Amino acid sequence: MTTVTKHKVLLIAGPTAVGKTALSLALAKQLNGEIISGDSMQVYRHLDIGTAKIMPEEQAGIPHHLIDIKNIDQRFTVAEFVSRTTALIIDISARGKLPIIVGGTGFYLQSLLAGYQFGPADNEPDMAYRQAWFDRAAVEGSDVAWMALKQRDPQAATAIAPANLVRVVRALEYVHTTGQLFSEQADTHGDTLDAYTLCLTAERALLYTRINQRVDQMVAAGLEQEARWLFDQGGAMLPAGKGIGYHEWFPYFNGEQTRDESIAKIKQDSRRYAKRQLTWFRNKMSVDWINLLEHPELRASIDQRLASWLS
Protein backbone atom coordinates (compact mmCIF):
# COMPACT_ATOMS: atom_id res chain seq x y z
CA MET A 1 0.00 0.00 0.00
CA THR A 2 1.29 3.45 -0.92
CA THR A 3 1.64 5.83 2.00
CA VAL A 4 0.38 9.32 1.22
CA THR A 5 2.38 12.15 2.74
CA LYS A 6 0.15 14.60 4.55
CA HIS A 7 1.49 18.14 4.46
CA LYS A 8 0.94 20.28 7.54
CA VAL A 9 -0.75 23.55 6.59
CA LEU A 10 -1.78 26.34 8.94
CA LEU A 11 -4.61 28.62 7.83
CA ILE A 12 -5.27 31.98 9.45
CA ALA A 13 -8.70 33.10 8.32
CA GLY A 14 -11.15 35.78 9.33
CA PRO A 15 -12.85 38.96 8.16
CA THR A 16 -11.10 42.10 7.04
CA ALA A 17 -9.45 44.31 9.69
CA VAL A 18 -9.38 41.61 12.37
CA GLY A 19 -5.59 41.29 12.73
CA LYS A 20 -4.66 38.35 10.48
CA THR A 21 -1.45 39.92 9.15
CA ALA A 22 0.08 40.65 12.56
CA LEU A 23 -0.66 37.14 13.83
CA SER A 24 0.65 35.53 10.66
CA LEU A 25 4.00 37.32 10.95
CA ALA A 26 4.38 36.33 14.60
CA LEU A 27 3.55 32.69 13.92
CA ALA A 28 5.72 32.51 10.82
CA LYS A 29 8.72 33.64 12.88
CA GLN A 30 7.83 31.29 15.70
CA LEU A 31 7.17 28.21 13.56
CA ASN A 32 9.71 28.72 10.74
CA GLY A 33 6.93 29.34 8.24
CA GLU A 34 6.35 30.96 4.89
CA ILE A 35 3.17 32.87 4.13
CA ILE A 36 0.83 32.26 1.20
CA SER A 37 -1.76 34.95 0.54
CA GLY A 38 -5.31 33.62 0.42
CA ASP A 39 -6.70 36.93 -0.79
CA SER A 40 -8.18 37.21 -4.28
CA MET A 41 -7.14 40.87 -4.72
CA GLN A 42 -3.60 40.93 -3.38
CA VAL A 43 -2.46 39.07 -6.49
CA TYR A 44 -2.73 42.31 -8.50
CA ARG A 45 0.30 44.49 -9.10
CA HIS A 46 -0.01 48.24 -8.35
CA LEU A 47 -3.08 47.79 -6.13
CA ASP A 48 -1.44 48.11 -2.73
CA ILE A 49 -3.51 50.42 -0.56
CA GLY A 50 -7.04 49.17 -1.23
CA THR A 51 -6.02 45.52 -0.85
CA ALA A 52 -4.23 46.15 2.49
CA LYS A 53 -1.25 44.43 0.90
CA ILE A 54 1.74 43.82 3.13
CA MET A 55 4.70 45.60 1.59
CA PRO A 56 8.22 44.11 1.35
CA GLU A 57 9.57 46.33 4.12
CA GLU A 58 6.78 45.09 6.43
CA GLN A 59 7.34 41.39 5.79
CA ALA A 60 10.09 41.05 8.43
CA GLY A 61 12.12 38.78 6.19
CA ILE A 62 9.33 36.21 5.97
CA PRO A 63 8.82 34.91 2.40
CA HIS A 64 5.37 35.82 1.06
CA HIS A 65 3.75 34.13 -1.93
CA LEU A 66 0.85 34.88 -4.33
CA ILE A 67 1.28 38.64 -4.00
CA ASP A 68 1.85 40.82 -7.09
CA ILE A 69 1.60 37.94 -9.57
CA LYS A 70 -1.10 39.31 -11.90
CA ASN A 71 -1.68 42.35 -14.05
CA ILE A 72 -4.96 44.17 -13.50
CA ASP A 73 -6.42 42.84 -16.77
CA GLN A 74 -5.81 39.20 -15.84
CA ARG A 75 -8.29 36.96 -14.07
CA PHE A 76 -7.30 34.99 -10.99
CA THR A 77 -9.57 31.99 -10.61
CA VAL A 78 -10.15 29.64 -7.73
CA ALA A 79 -8.74 26.87 -9.91
CA GLU A 80 -5.48 28.77 -10.30
CA PHE A 81 -5.38 29.50 -6.59
CA VAL A 82 -5.75 25.81 -5.72
CA SER A 83 -3.15 24.78 -8.30
CA ARG A 84 -0.57 27.39 -7.32
CA THR A 85 -1.11 26.93 -3.60
CA THR A 86 -0.81 23.16 -3.85
CA ALA A 87 2.57 23.52 -5.57
CA LEU A 88 3.70 26.04 -2.96
CA ILE A 89 2.65 23.79 -0.08
CA ILE A 90 4.70 20.93 -1.50
CA ASP A 91 7.72 23.17 -2.10
CA ILE A 92 7.63 24.90 1.29
CA SER A 93 7.15 21.59 3.11
CA ALA A 94 10.03 20.00 1.19
CA ARG A 95 12.31 22.76 2.48
CA GLY A 96 11.38 21.95 6.06
CA LYS A 97 9.17 24.97 6.59
CA LEU A 98 5.50 25.36 7.52
CA PRO A 99 3.09 26.73 4.88
CA ILE A 100 0.86 29.40 6.45
CA ILE A 101 -2.10 30.53 4.34
CA VAL A 102 -3.53 33.89 5.35
CA GLY A 103 -6.69 35.40 3.94
CA GLY A 104 -10.37 36.08 4.00
CA THR A 105 -11.51 34.71 0.63
CA GLY A 106 -13.50 31.84 2.10
CA PHE A 107 -14.36 30.07 -1.13
CA TYR A 108 -10.69 29.86 -2.09
CA LEU A 109 -9.74 28.40 1.28
CA GLN A 110 -12.65 25.96 1.29
CA SER A 111 -11.82 24.78 -2.22
CA LEU A 112 -8.23 24.14 -1.21
CA LEU A 113 -9.15 22.17 1.89
CA ALA A 114 -11.91 20.19 0.20
CA GLY A 115 -9.60 19.28 -2.65
CA TYR A 116 -11.92 20.40 -5.41
CA GLN A 117 -10.75 19.08 -8.76
CA PHE A 118 -10.91 21.33 -11.81
CA GLY A 119 -10.75 19.73 -15.24
CA PRO A 120 -8.87 21.41 -18.10
CA ALA A 121 -12.12 22.54 -19.71
CA ASP A 122 -13.60 23.50 -16.37
CA ASN A 123 -11.47 26.36 -15.16
CA GLU A 124 -14.20 27.52 -12.82
CA PRO A 125 -16.53 25.50 -10.60
CA ASP A 126 -20.23 25.35 -11.36
CA MET A 127 -21.43 27.44 -8.44
CA ALA A 128 -25.11 27.20 -9.33
CA TYR A 129 -24.96 23.40 -9.52
CA ARG A 130 -23.08 23.17 -6.25
CA GLN A 131 -25.35 25.58 -4.40
CA ALA A 132 -28.43 23.75 -5.68
CA TRP A 133 -27.25 20.60 -3.92
CA PHE A 134 -26.42 22.46 -0.71
CA ASP A 135 -29.87 24.08 -0.77
CA ARG A 136 -31.61 20.80 -1.45
CA ALA A 137 -29.66 19.04 1.30
CA ALA A 138 -30.63 21.78 3.74
CA VAL A 139 -34.29 20.91 3.13
CA GLU A 140 -34.18 17.15 2.52
CA GLY A 141 -31.05 16.14 4.45
CA SER A 142 -27.54 15.29 3.27
CA ASP A 143 -28.59 11.75 2.30
CA VAL A 144 -30.34 13.10 -0.80
CA ALA A 145 -27.01 14.15 -2.31
CA TRP A 146 -25.34 10.89 -1.33
CA MET A 147 -28.15 8.83 -2.93
CA ALA A 148 -27.71 10.81 -6.15
CA LEU A 149 -23.99 10.08 -6.07
CA LYS A 150 -24.69 6.40 -5.44
CA GLN A 151 -26.74 6.29 -8.65
CA ARG A 152 -24.12 8.08 -10.74
CA ASP A 153 -20.88 6.76 -9.22
CA PRO A 154 -21.49 3.85 -6.81
CA GLN A 155 -17.79 3.37 -6.10
CA ALA A 156 -17.37 7.00 -5.05
CA ALA A 157 -20.45 6.79 -2.84
CA THR A 158 -19.02 3.73 -1.11
CA ALA A 159 -15.86 5.67 -0.26
CA ILE A 160 -17.57 8.84 1.01
CA ALA A 161 -19.69 9.08 4.14
CA PRO A 162 -23.23 10.39 3.50
CA ALA A 163 -22.72 13.02 6.21
CA ASN A 164 -19.69 14.48 4.42
CA LEU A 165 -21.82 16.78 2.30
CA VAL A 166 -18.97 18.94 0.98
CA ARG A 167 -17.14 15.91 -0.39
CA VAL A 168 -20.32 14.33 -1.75
CA VAL A 169 -21.22 17.53 -3.62
CA ARG A 170 -17.65 17.81 -4.84
CA ALA A 171 -17.95 14.33 -6.36
CA LEU A 172 -21.32 15.13 -7.93
CA GLU A 173 -19.93 18.33 -9.40
CA TYR A 174 -16.94 16.51 -10.84
CA VAL A 175 -19.20 14.00 -12.60
CA HIS A 176 -21.46 16.82 -13.78
CA THR A 177 -18.71 19.06 -15.17
CA THR A 178 -16.33 16.47 -16.63
CA GLY A 179 -18.62 13.60 -17.62
CA GLN A 180 -16.19 11.25 -15.87
CA LEU A 181 -16.49 9.19 -12.72
CA PHE A 182 -15.10 10.81 -9.62
CA SER A 183 -13.87 7.41 -8.44
CA GLU A 184 -11.66 7.09 -11.51
CA GLN A 185 -9.75 10.35 -11.05
CA ALA A 186 -6.78 10.58 -8.77
CA ASP A 187 -7.51 12.84 -5.85
CA THR A 188 -3.96 13.98 -5.39
CA HIS A 189 -4.65 16.97 -3.23
CA GLY A 190 -7.52 17.33 -0.81
CA ASP A 191 -6.72 14.27 1.29
CA THR A 192 -2.99 15.04 1.47
CA LEU A 193 -3.35 18.09 3.72
CA ASP A 194 -3.23 18.04 7.50
CA ALA A 195 -4.70 21.50 7.93
CA TYR A 196 -5.44 23.48 11.05
CA THR A 197 -7.56 26.61 10.66
CA LEU A 198 -7.59 29.51 13.09
CA CYS A 199 -10.36 32.00 12.44
CA LEU A 200 -10.01 35.40 14.06
CA THR A 201 -13.17 37.19 15.06
CA ALA A 202 -14.37 40.14 17.13
CA GLU A 203 -17.56 41.61 18.51
CA ARG A 204 -19.40 43.19 15.60
CA ALA A 205 -19.40 46.80 16.83
CA LEU A 206 -15.63 46.71 17.39
CA LEU A 207 -15.00 45.06 14.03
CA TYR A 208 -17.12 47.62 12.19
CA THR A 209 -15.32 50.48 13.96
CA ARG A 210 -11.97 49.03 12.91
CA ILE A 211 -13.19 48.66 9.33
CA ASN A 212 -14.31 52.29 9.20
CA GLN A 213 -10.99 53.42 10.65
CA ARG A 214 -9.06 51.31 8.17
CA VAL A 215 -10.91 52.87 5.24
CA ASP A 216 -10.10 56.35 6.57
CA GLN A 217 -6.44 55.34 6.84
CA MET A 218 -6.48 54.01 3.28
CA VAL A 219 -7.96 57.25 1.99
CA ALA A 220 -5.31 59.23 3.85
CA ALA A 221 -2.62 56.97 2.35
CA GLY A 222 -3.76 57.65 -1.23
CA LEU A 223 -6.55 55.19 -2.01
CA GLU A 224 -8.35 57.71 -4.22
CA GLN A 225 -5.28 58.13 -6.42
CA GLU A 226 -4.82 54.37 -6.67
CA ALA A 227 -8.47 53.96 -7.67
CA ARG A 228 -8.18 56.82 -10.18
CA TRP A 229 -5.23 55.05 -11.83
CA LEU A 230 -7.26 51.84 -12.06
CA PHE A 231 -10.22 53.79 -13.45
CA ASP A 232 -8.03 55.30 -16.15
CA GLN A 233 -6.81 51.82 -17.14
CA GLY A 234 -10.34 50.55 -17.71
CA GLY A 235 -12.00 50.52 -14.31
CA ALA A 236 -14.95 48.18 -13.96
CA MET A 237 -14.13 46.52 -17.28
CA LEU A 238 -11.04 44.96 -15.69
CA PRO A 239 -11.05 41.90 -13.40
CA ALA A 240 -9.27 43.96 -10.74
CA GLY A 241 -11.82 46.75 -11.07
CA LYS A 242 -14.50 44.84 -9.21
CA GLY A 243 -12.70 44.88 -5.86
CA ILE A 244 -14.07 46.63 -2.79
CA GLY A 245 -12.26 49.90 -2.26
CA TYR A 246 -11.99 50.56 -5.97
CA HIS A 247 -15.29 50.25 -7.81
CA GLU A 248 -17.03 52.53 -5.31
CA TRP A 249 -14.92 55.44 -6.59
CA PHE A 250 -15.92 55.05 -10.22
CA PRO A 251 -19.32 56.84 -9.98
CA TYR A 252 -17.51 59.77 -8.33
CA PHE A 253 -14.98 59.88 -11.15
CA ASN A 254 -17.92 59.87 -13.58
CA GLY A 255 -19.54 62.79 -11.77
CA GLU A 256 -22.43 60.67 -10.51
CA GLN A 257 -21.86 60.96 -6.75
CA THR A 258 -19.76 62.90 -4.25
CA ARG A 259 -16.39 61.96 -2.83
CA ASP A 260 -17.88 61.52 0.64
CA GLU A 261 -20.55 59.22 -0.78
CA SER A 262 -17.85 57.05 -2.34
CA ILE A 263 -15.98 56.77 0.94
CA ALA A 264 -19.18 55.95 2.81
CA LYS A 265 -19.98 53.25 0.23
CA ILE A 266 -16.54 51.67 0.68
CA LYS A 267 -17.14 51.47 4.42
CA GLN A 268 -20.60 50.00 3.91
CA ASP A 269 -19.40 47.42 1.37
CA SER A 270 -16.46 46.48 3.60
CA ARG A 271 -18.73 45.93 6.61
CA ARG A 272 -21.13 43.83 4.56
CA TYR A 273 -18.23 41.81 3.18
CA ALA A 274 -16.94 41.16 6.71
CA LYS A 275 -20.38 39.90 7.70
CA ARG A 276 -20.44 37.55 4.69
CA GLN A 277 -16.94 36.33 5.53
CA LEU A 278 -17.93 35.44 9.07
CA THR A 279 -21.06 33.67 7.84
CA TRP A 280 -19.02 31.67 5.33
CA PHE A 281 -16.42 30.53 7.88
CA ARG A 282 -19.18 29.67 10.33
CA ASN A 283 -21.27 27.62 7.90
CA LYS A 284 -18.85 26.25 5.31
CA MET A 285 -15.61 25.47 7.14
CA SER A 286 -14.38 23.74 10.28
CA VAL A 287 -12.37 26.35 12.19
CA ASP A 288 -11.16 27.21 15.67
CA TRP A 289 -12.53 30.64 16.56
CA ILE A 290 -10.50 33.07 18.62
CA ASN A 291 -11.05 36.71 19.59
CA LEU A 292 -7.60 38.21 20.09
CA LEU A 293 -8.68 41.82 19.66
CA GLU A 294 -10.73 41.79 22.83
CA HIS A 295 -8.92 38.94 24.59
CA PRO A 296 -5.17 39.16 23.86
CA GLU A 297 -4.53 36.82 26.77
CA LEU A 298 -5.81 34.01 24.53
CA ARG A 299 -2.60 34.25 22.50
CA ALA A 300 -1.05 31.58 24.75
CA SER A 301 -3.89 29.20 23.93
CA ILE A 302 -2.97 29.45 20.24
CA ASP A 303 0.52 28.23 21.03
CA GLN A 304 -0.94 25.32 22.99
CA ARG A 305 -3.29 24.35 20.16
CA LEU A 306 -0.54 24.55 17.57
CA ALA A 307 1.88 22.54 19.70
CA SER A 308 -0.71 19.78 19.97
CA TRP A 309 -1.42 19.85 16.23
CA LEU A 310 2.25 19.86 15.25
CA SER A 311 3.25 17.05 17.62
UniProtKB/Swiss-Prot annotation:
Keyword Transferase listed? The answer is yes
Q: Where is this region: Interaction with substrate tRNA?
A: 39-42
Q: Which family does it belong to?
A: Belongs to the IPP transferase family.
Keywords from UniProt, A to Z, are: ATP-binding, Magnesium, Nucleotide-binding, Transferase, tRNA processing
Q: Which PANTHER family match?
A: TRNA DIMETHYLALLYLTRANSFERASE
> Which residues does this entry assign to the site Interaction with substrate tRNA?
T105, R130
Looking up NCBIfam families in the UniProt record yields: miaA
Q: Per the entry, which co-factors are needed?
A: Mg(2+)
User: Which GO molecular function entries does the Swiss-Prot or TrEMBL record give?
Assistant: ATP binding; tRNA dimethylallyltransferase activity
Top-level class of the enzyme under EC nomenclature: transferase
Subunit annotation: Monomer.
Q: What is this protein called?
A: tRNA dimethylallyltransferase
Residues the record lists as binding substrate = T16, A17, V18, G19, K20, T21
Q: Which GO terms fall under biological process for this protein? A: tRNA modification
State the encoding gene.
miaA
State its Enzyme Commission number(s): 2.5.1.75
Function recorded in the entry: Catalyzes the transfer of a dimethylallyl group onto the adenine at position 37 in tRNAs that read codons beginning with uridine, leading to the formation of N6-(dimethylallyl)adenosine (i(6)A).
